[in-house]
Design a protein with these regions (language model features):
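P-loop potassium selectivity filter motif centered on the GYG triad
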Residues: 60-108, 170-249, 304-381
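Long hydrophobic segments that form regular secondary structure
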Residues: 242-273, 280-281, 346-418
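Mid-bilayer segments of alpha-helical transmembrane spans in multi-pass integral membrane proteins
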Residues: 77-89, 109-121, 125, 153
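N-terminal alpha-helical transmembrane segments of multi-pass membrane transport
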Residues: 1-79, 123-124, 131-139, 143-184, ...
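Hydrophobic alpha-helical transmembrane segments of multi-pass membrane proteins
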Residues: 42-46, 106-117, 126, 149, ...
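Transmembrane helix-loop junctions in multi-pass membrane proteins
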Residues: 51-61, 131-135, 163-174, 232-238, ...
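Selective recognition of specific alpha-helical transmembrane segments in multi-pass small-molecule
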Residues: 41-55, 147-170, 254, 270-297, ...
Length: 435
């Protein structure tokens, strides 16, 4: 897909690709200088942000809003639009009580696709810059974006969504269901004046919608923004251990595959495997650390005589370890594994609450976040994040041994190191200054 015009999917998606080029007046054979490539990416992102903002503000007047949700407030709409446009997927709202089905699909899920495709396109352009010798161009952003969406993301998402539906993930356009409780519940409420009242709840609202189609791209594109507030801990997003396994595989699928792409495009497959191996070693070290401390349980509970050992006898079952904030159907292993994967990949999807981890168990997810996407990382971003680290390492190693630093046959010059350091400092600068 990156360096060949034909794939085995060309018969299916080729006509669609050519139609998109014709409608958008894109010359697929025209390549762009890095400045034009960057400008196209920024322009596409800004337009996408404005469209998503408008969708949220006009939500009440648009179709596929069976619950009649009002338009999203201006500040929240901008927050959400900028978040999903940049593949951040930070959420300051509950999806099931704020967003209509149309906004979830045409707005949020759409940006799950194109933000991921943008990241992959930038990674491919980065690799082209390393692999090419004399060329002054890096490819065509519009072609890379289109092909990534059609030939990579869409096929995997179609298959993945069907697999998730088979496991019980919801996919419909039905209004929320009002279910009568078998046993009414008494709920104590406090009004603005501090007066307490007791309300009897007899009906439960069961939220639903086109979840499976958004869930798979949420993981495959390392987006992370959930259809429901509970994210992948919600049984309608992630009902079974097998769906949990599929979603974890999806998170790492593209980021790990891009290391192979690196080897193929540079003509040095051993180097691609070396990068992959470095990522795997760091990932496994993180996972086993999280699992060890979570399986041991909370030491404070031990002081109070609370049993945290696994029990399955005399009709009693207990998973063991620190189960606070974790789903029983996943247990310690799947929760620790998911926490490591999602923070390695900057995905943001969760199947347990990381704040409820033990201090040392929760340290690893926090460390993964602070590393800035080098252990597989987000789709595209993880690869070029690791490559930046490699450039800096090669440069420092060259200084130590007194040799001119080279990477894949190219000299590492002062301007290259300056750009690499700029990449590193922007991350720290953004956190320190804006906090």
């Amino acid at each position: 897909m990156c360096y060949s015009d034909l794939t085995f999917l060309s018969r299916v998606f080729g006509p669609v690709e050519r139609l998109i080029y014709r409608i958008c007046r894109i010359d697929e054979h025209e390549e762009q200088h890095w400045t034009a490539y960057t400008a196209a990416m920024l322009m596409f992102s800004v337009v996408g942000l404005l469209v998503l903002y408008g969708l949220q503000r006009l939500q009440y007047f648009l179709p596929l809003n069976p619950q009649g949700f009002p338009g999203v407030a201006p500040d929240l709409a901008f927050n959400t639009a900028s978040s999903f446009t940049t593949n951040t997927n930070w959420q300051a709202y509950s999806g099931e009580s704020t967003m209509s089905y149309l906004v979830q699909m045409a707005g949020l899920a759409f940006h799950n696709f194109v933000s991921a495709a943008t990241g992959i396109a930038l990674a491919i352009a980065f690799i082209r810059g390393i692999a090419r010798r004399e060329a002054k161009t890096l490819g065509n952003f519009w072609v890379d974006l289109t092909r990534t969406t059609l030939y990579v993301l869409l096929p995997f998402c179609i298959i993945g969504a069907l697999a998730l539906v088979s496991q019980g993930v919801v996919q419909n356009f039905s209004p929320y269901t009002q279910a009568t409780l078998v046993e009414p519940q008494q709920v104590e409420k406090t009004d603005d004046r501090g007066n307490k009242t007791v309300e009897t709840v007899t009906v439960q609202t069961i939220a639903q919608g086109p979840v499976a189609s958004q869930e798979i791209i949420k993981e495959l594109g390392t987006n992370g923004g959930g259809f429901f507030n509970a994210n992948s801990a919600h049984p309608f997003e992630n009902p079974t251990p097998f769906s949990n396994f599929l979603e974890m595989i999806a998170v790492f699928a593209i980021s790990s595959g891009l290391t192979y792409t690196l080897g193929r495009m540079t003509g040095n497959q051993k180097h691609g495997w070396a990068v992959f191996s470095a990522m795997v070693i760091l990932f496994l070290a993180g996972f086993f650390t999280v699992y060890y401390f979570e399986a041991r349980g909370n030491p404070i509970f031990n002081q109070h005589g609370v049993t945290q050992a696994a029990i399955e006898a005399d009709g009693q079952e207990q998973a063991g370890g620190n189960m606070e904030g974790k789903e029983v159907r996943f247990g310690i292993v799947n929760s620790a594994l998911w926490a490591t994967i999602t923070t390695d990949a900057s995905c943001g999807a969760v199947n347990s609450m990381h704040d409820s981890f033990t201090p040392l168990g929760g340290m690893i997810p926090l460390l993964n976040i602070m590393l800035g996407e080098i252990i597989f990382g987000g789709v595209g971003a993880g690869l070029y994040g690791m490559l930046v680290m490699i450039v800096l390492t090669v440069f420092i190693a060259g200084l130590m041994v007194g040799r001119t630093p080279e990477y894949l046959g190219k000299k590492i010059e002062a301007k290259d190191v300056k750009m690499a350091m700029l990449y590193v400092l922007v991350f720290a600068f953004s956190i320190l200054v804006f906090s």
